[in-house]
Amino acid sequence: MSFETAFERIVGHAHAKAVLTAALATDRVAHAYLFHGEAHIGKFLTAMAFAKMGLCPHPKIGRSSGRPTLASCGQCPSCLAVDSGSHPDLQIVRPDGVQIKIRQIRDLQNSIVFKPMIGSRKWFLIDEADAMNPEAANGFLKTLEEPPDHSVLILVSARPQALLPTILSRCQAVRFSPPPLQALSPWLQKQRGLGPEEARLLATLSMGRIGIAAEGDPAELKIERDRILGALSKERLEDPADLFSQSDDLAATPEQLDRSLDTIEIWLRDVLIVPHDPDASLLINQDIPEQIMAWGRAVSTDAVLETLTLIHLLKRAAPRNLNHALVLETVLLKLRDAVIGESTTGSKTGEAGRVRK
Ligand SMILES: [Zn+2]
């Protein structure tokens, strides 16, 4: 895989890119960064581009719109080694299964003490850093407390609140937000050679998640969205057996759960907006305004806001090892109460519920 040579080629994240460019241009790269923000919006790709630039012995320095720009050359042995995953001064740590384990952190520690082989720094990218188990996190903290001068550690996380506060406090935090759809659509036209309509639909369906937009098939994404939204119909929510099988199905994997929660969250956002948006220009699901309008008519604004708050809490605070189906079930039960117009304070959950192992 060929990683980007310049930040300009990565859509969005202007602030993050400016901070990182300045760090390299002034040779003030921090020892530890935390790249945080929602999943699939380009944090890891930016980290790879940053490391590639930092490692390249012939970076191109320029200016664009009055700001300094920096690019790796993309052709030297160092750049090619980054692309092929064989650079001796770049190590990537990812969860082994669902966790980052102490063994992986020990490997990092054994490597970080040695001087870089080619470049001037050694780069370590810890993807999904919040997946470190407690033993790994404590081990990692020791490295963060006294990192060797030549090392750069980049923690990438969509759930930074799951990291130890002592880890967070030692990293320079760089926040990433999904790029605006208006920016993503032209980028997709250029990057993927799509027509304007197709690019807009793909930008919409990927919800600003550049990682998905860059690779996703618009037709498949649409089918997936419609499958998730199908679970929100009144008939299906009212059928307890169906509701529980949907919860299992739409939360089969952690990624699937994330997609389902995002899709529901955006749907609810659209439900709030649609009455005030006659030409549907502000909707994210721009292709289905009537469906959004019809669903929204049956539900109170308060219930929608309460569900959004619940989803927000679950996304941020639910521990990684929580039963995924249970998370989605909680949301669907809340929505069921919303569409049948009942308060959630009663024992509805218990009546319809079943015992989960
Ligand atoms: Zn190079």
Q: What label would you give each PLM region?
A:
Residues 18-24, 102-123, 131, 135-143:
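Conserved alpha-helical scaffold flanking the Walker A/P-loop in AAA+ ATPase domains
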Residues 96-102, 129, 173-174:
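Flexible beta-alpha connector loops of hexameric P-loop NTPases
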Residues 36-37, 92-97:
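A short hydrophobic beta-strand->loop->alpha-helix junction that borders the nucleotide-binding pocket
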Residues 73-79:
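Short cysteine clusters
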Residues 124-127, 140, 151-157:
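Structural recognition of the conserved hydrophobic beta-strand(s) that form the central parallel beta-sheet
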Residues 1-52, 60-63, 81, 149-152, ...:
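Charged, glycine-rich active-site and insertion segments that engage polyanionic ligands
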Residues 32, 69-73:
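Residues immediately within or flanking Cys/His clusters that coordinate Zn2+
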